[in-house]
């Protein structure tokens, strides 16, 4: 069955590269949907969702965004619109995967478009700034693939063709095998940070009682933040939050903070949560 793969990018600067990805996807028998987050300039490539529609999703006109006179604010507004559009495509079953390419501004656009998508939905970002301080951990979706381009995405050449072909092949492969996550058993999350003894006891005990257990490595944005995200996606029946050292990290400016809203999601959603002060005696800076 053909899949619908969304391509998010700025056609005013990356039309050639986006067209290359679209052609690859279509050669593999799938449908490509281009979402244009560009702001100025013309493009030879017609999008499926125009920049005007993206701006409208953010309750602005393109003229409003141009009038901001600030590239950062402009792309942030377009990112808001792109995120709403991509999420709507997912929610209506009109998208099976999303890929984006970009430099600094295009990366902001793509990451925002992927951020609200659920765990398990295929998402891949090709970026020239993937592994730099410009991309913070909290900007990235929990299970998103980040691909660093070794050269700038400024037209097609022997290197960019290979990078984009690999990225397109990856997202096609993920779309072909991806299915919506079905929680067949009650799912319980347990947090840990290199503390194994209680997990070795709790996990089999819960499994014997018909539960499935997911262990969260509580190491900040890819730990406790992941837990809060999974809870908000309503995938869990309860939480054993026995390793809460990320709170100390947050209070003391530690490197492994999970943000100021740690411990809040379970109560907001309304599922049982047991909390213990595990790993509170140290933090990282």
State where each predicted segment sits.
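A glycine- and small/hydrophobic-rich beta-loop-beta segment
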Residues: 242-285
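Gly/Ser/Thr-rich loops at beta-strand to alpha-helix junctions
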Residues: 10-16, 96-109, 130, 188-199, ...
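Cap/lid and interdomain-hinge subdomains that line or gate substrate/regulatory clefts
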Residues: 66-67, 134-192
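Phosphate/nucleotide-donor binding subsite
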Residues: 46-92
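N-terminal phosphate-binding or glycine-rich loops at protein starts, especially the Walker A/P-loop
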Residues: 2-43, 97, 103, 107-116, ...
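Short, acidic/small-residue loops that bind anionic groups at enzyme active sites
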Residues: 97, 109-138, 148-149, 214-218, ...
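Generic secondary-structure signature for well-ordered alpha-helical cores
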Residues: 13-16, 23-31, 83-91, 115, ...
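Glycine-rich phosphate/diphosphate-binding loop of Rossmann-like nucleotide-binding domains
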Residues: 14-26, 33-34, 39-52, 183-220, ...
């Amino acid at each position: 069955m053909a899949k619908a793969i969304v391509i998010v990018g700025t056609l005013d600067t990356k039309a050639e590269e986006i067209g290359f990805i679209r052609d690859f996807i279509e050669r593999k028998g799938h449908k490509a949907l281009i979402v244009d987050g560009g702001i100025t300039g013309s493009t030879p490539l017609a999008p499926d969702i125009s920049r005007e529609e993206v701006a409208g999703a953010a309750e602005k006109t393109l003229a409003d965004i141009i009038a901001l006179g600030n590239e950062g604010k402009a792309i942030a507004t377009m990112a808001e619109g792109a995120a709403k559009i991509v999420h709507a495509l997912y929610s209506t079953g009109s998208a099976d995967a999303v890929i984006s390419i970009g430099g600094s501004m295009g990366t902001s656009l793509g990451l925002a478009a992927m951020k609200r998508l659920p765990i398990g939905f295929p998402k891949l970002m090709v970026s020239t700034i993937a592994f730099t301080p410009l991309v913070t951990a909290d900007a990235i979706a929990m299970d998103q693939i980040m691909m660093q381009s070794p050269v700038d995405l400024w037209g097609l050449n022997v290197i960019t063709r290979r990078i984009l072909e690999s990225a397109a092949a990856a997202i096609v492969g993920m779309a072909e095998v991806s299915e919506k996550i079905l929680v067949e058993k009650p799912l319980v999350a347990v947090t840990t940070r290199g503390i194994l003894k209680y997990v070795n006891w709790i996990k089999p005990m819960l499994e014997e009682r018909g539960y499935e257990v997911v262990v969260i490595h509580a190491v900040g944005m890819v730990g406790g933040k992941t837990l809060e995200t999974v809870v908000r996606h309503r995938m869990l029946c309860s939480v054993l939050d026995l390793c809460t050292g990320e709170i100390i990290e947050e209070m003391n400016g530690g490197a492994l903070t999970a943000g100021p809203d740690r411990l809040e999601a379970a109560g907001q959603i309304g599922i049982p949560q047991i909390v213990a002060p595990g790993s509170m005696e140290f933090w990282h800076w």
